[in-house]
UniProtKB/Swiss-Prot annotation:
Signal peptide: none annotated. PANTHER family: ORGANIC HYDROPEROXIDE RESISTANCE PROTEIN-LIKE. It comes from Mycoplasma genitalium (strain ATCC 33530 / DSM 19775 / NCTC 10195 / G37). This is Organic hydroperoxide resistance protein-like. It comes from the Bacteria. Belongs to the OsmC/Ohr family. GO terms for biological process: response to oxidative stress.
């Protein structure tokens, strides 16, 4: 396996403070607000959801090119990330939804499944931590 990118993130403040990467990214952190109200700082779950969504979206673009799928509007990827607690341990769970403007469920199903196989974040989240794939509002 050939290394194509590497980054290092550092923090010493847990969820209350900031995190930075050695290549220049920096953001303030806070605990997630349970009431889903807007917060000025980010939390790790938001960062994970954002990274997963952008990675999965890129996989969708690649699969569309490989299989010559086309839609009149770009498909939209939504990633849901949940933080759970059980027996004193925290667990991250995540799921992916793809929204297309196509009525062809078979093409959409092939697209989301191939993108799921390709996306490195999807390969990280497996088994009981994966909430599943959803296509145009229908859970697969």
């Amino acid at each position: 396996m050939a290394l194509i990118y590497k980054t290092v993130a550092q923090t010493e403040t847990g969820r209350e403070g900031s995190v930075k990467t050695l290549d220049g990214f920096q953001t303030k952190l806070s605990f997630p607000k349970p009431d889903l109200s807007v917060q000025t700082e980010n939390n790790p779950e938001q960062l994970f959801a954002s990274a997963y969504a952008s990675c999965f979206s890129q996989a969708v673009i690649v699969v569309m090119q490989q299989h010559q799928f086309s839609f009149s509007k770009k498909p939209v990827v939504s990633v849901k990330v949940e933080l759970h607690q059980e027996n004193g341990l925290f667990h991250i769970k995540a799921g992916v939804e793809l929204t297309t403007n196509s009525n062809d469920q078979e093409v959409g199903k092939k697209l989301i499944q191939k993108a799921h196989e390709m996306c490195p974040f999807s390969r990280l989240i497996r088994n009981e931590n994966f909430l599943g794939l959803t296509l145009n509002g229908i859970k697969l």
